[in-house]
Amino acid sequence: MSTSSCSFKDRRVSILCCKFCKQVLSSRGMKAVLLADTEIDLFSTDIPPTNAVDFIGRCYFTEICKCKLKDIACLKCGNIVGYHVIVPCCSCLLSCNNGHFWMFHSQAVYGINRLDSTGVNFLLWGNLPEVEENTDEDMLDISAEECIR
């Protein structure tokens, strides 16, 4: 991944939830834009969501680039919430990107900004460990108080 010339460490970390059923899909979300069309907002994550989504349908390619994609659906309600980049194309790999291969449509998910350990400041991607001690499974039982924040 070509991330050396661009930095994502100051981006906020979000909890990603399904808009249709409120299911937590990931605790490591980042607001992003589509590489092939920067007018399209989305969310992404670097770690495969655990017990929250599954593949649906067949692999496909877009007209804009040659990435091989497969849709993902929420396990709770069955709605398509995004896609996984199965095989990224050279053009996207060479672009300024965050290295994430799990993408979520902004029409299908919403993000809740996470707070750091002080509980006062937003958690930034640069302060997030590569592999967190808390897994996404732990985040599935998110409290109502956390969702309200």
Curated annotation (Swiss-Prot):
Species, as recorded: Bos taurus
Known role: May play a role in the regulation of cellular reactive oxygen species metabolism. May participate in cell growth regulation.
Cellular localisation: Cytoplasm; Mitochondrion
InterPro entries found in the cross-reference section: YPEH2ZP
Recorded name of the encoding gene: FAM72A
Protein name: Protein FAM72A
Tissue expression profile of the protein: Expressed at high levels in stomach and also in kidney and, at low levels, in heart (at protein level). In the stomach, highly expressed in foveolar cells, parietal cells and chief cells (at protein level). In kidney, expressed in endothelial cells, mesangial and epithelial cells (parietal and visceral epithelium) around glomerulus (at protein level).
Gene Ontology annotations for the cellular component aspect, listed alphabetically: cytosol; mitochondrion
Recorded superkingdom: Eukaryota
Disulfide bonds: none
